[in-house]
Amino acid sequence: MFDALVNGRIDTGSLRFEVEYHDIEELNRGAGLGRADISKISCAVLPAIAEHYALLDSGAALGRGNGPLLVRRAGDTRPIRRVAVPGLHTTANALMGKLFPEIEERTPLLFSRIAAAVERG
């Protein structure tokens, strides 16, 4: 997201950055606690932190072909009763609640583990 900035591809003058990488749920939690000067967050938490942070013009992870996505095992036509979400304070979870309120069982998992969990059932 901040590749050019953190990897020295643009001149930042005397500014230096200390970069930390975390799961989106941890980033959301950290922003809520004011831990970072700049952070990626889920759009769903913006109202809760807007008093302390400003939204940047770039860096969004929403759009055609990227998150949030609803996936299931190929050939499975049963009604969806439970889903894995990348955190309870994420845009994916907020949209799930609005679009599919009947799916009440939402299990938070690291984003990188969701596909394998879906495959396993």
Ranges and model annotations:
Residues 1-61, 68:
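N-terminal hydrophobic or amphipathic helices and topogenic motifs
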Residues 1-8, 22, 66-121:
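Bilobed "Venus flytrap"/periplasmic-binding protein-like clamshell domains
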